Structure formats: C-alpha cells, structure tokens
Design a protein with these regions (language model features):
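Extended hydrophobic-aromatic, low-complexity segments
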Residues: 134-135, 147, 164
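Short amphipathic alpha-helical interaction segments
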Residues: 142-158
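A short, conserved structural fragment
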Residues: 157-167
Length: 169
C-alpha cells in the first residue's frame, strides 16, 4: 500500500481530504487482482511486491533478500561485506573529496552480530515467496531454524500466516 510521507504533495492533499485512498480491504482486493493479472501475463511473483518472467528476477533484490554480500560503491551507496553493513558519504562532492584525499568515504558502519544476522535472515527471507531454507539457515549459522525460532514459527503457522513447504518456511 502507499505510504504517504509528511512534507509531500500527497500528504498535504490527504490532510485536506483531497486524496481518496482505498481502505485495507480494498487494497487486498486490488493486490489479489494484480497478482492474477501479472500471472496471466507470465510475470510470476517472487517477492512481496515484485513480479518477473521466470529467470528475469532482479539479481540485486534477490541478493539483498537472501542476505548475501553486496558492495556499495558511490556517493550515498550502502553495502554489506564480511558482516559489516555500511553507508557511504553523500552528496557526491563530499564523497569525491574523501576519495581524493585517500580517505575511505564511509559515513556509517555496523558490524552485524550473530543474533542480528539470524534476525535479518528471517525478516529478509520472508519477503520472498519461496521463503527461507532451513538447510541454508543451519549452514550459515550452525543452528537449526527450529531451535532458534521454533515457537515463533509454530505460532505463525497456527495463525495461518506462514507455512512449511519441504525444506522451506
């Protein structure tokens, strides 16, 4: 659904009652219609809100949702390398000054803890329609998915919010 941010034209229109937005039930109906239409055109849903022809999915998005390494290069870019999540300085003038002076243009850096990495694996992986591989989780973290999140997973299964399909949650 559309998130209307403060200090935008849409926000101002919404506050004046001049931007009619659908309610949650209508958004659900509209999204289900979208899924049906996209699939009828050969675009399959592979992530919460992304569709593509088979084998044409966004590599960048999938790397991100699979919690894999990616380098952020350029002003304002973000990266995740060797457990370090970072963002570069922006705008480009400041970025180029840093690089020109031989200084790494890192604005923020955070070493992701093992617990944070597991949490990220879950919330990022659950964005994909194929979910999270229990085998890959064990391979990455040396713990089974159920030993870490078993109670939560079962509660979500009981509420019919997620399902287990073979190796995947």
């Amino acid at each position: 659904s559309l998130i209307v941010e403060p200090k935008t034209v849409f926000y101002n229109l919404m506050n004046k009652g001049k931007l009619p937005l659908p309610g949650e039930d209508m958004e659900t109906v509209m999204f289900e219609m979208l899924i049906e239409h996209m699939e009828s055109k050969g675009r399959m849903r592979y992530e919460i809100s992304n569709f593509a022809r088979p084998d044409y999915e966004s590599i960048h998005n999938l790397l991100y949702w699979e919690n894999e390494t990616y380098a952020g290069i350029g002003a304002g870019a973000h990266g995740y390398v060797s457990g370090n999540r970072y963002s570069n300085i922006g705008p480009i003038k400041r970025y180029m000054e840093q690089v020109g002076n031989g200084i790494r243009p890192i604005q923020q850096s955070h070493i992701v803890t093992p617990v944070e990495a597991m949490e990220e694996e879950m919330f990022l992986g659950l964005r994909k329609t194929d979910g999270i591989s229990t085998a890959l989780f064990h391979e990455k973290f040396g713990q089974s998915l159920t030993s870490v999140y078993g109670e939560t997973i079962q509660a979500l299964i009981d509420k019919e919010l997620i399902e287990v399909n073979g190796d995947r949650v």
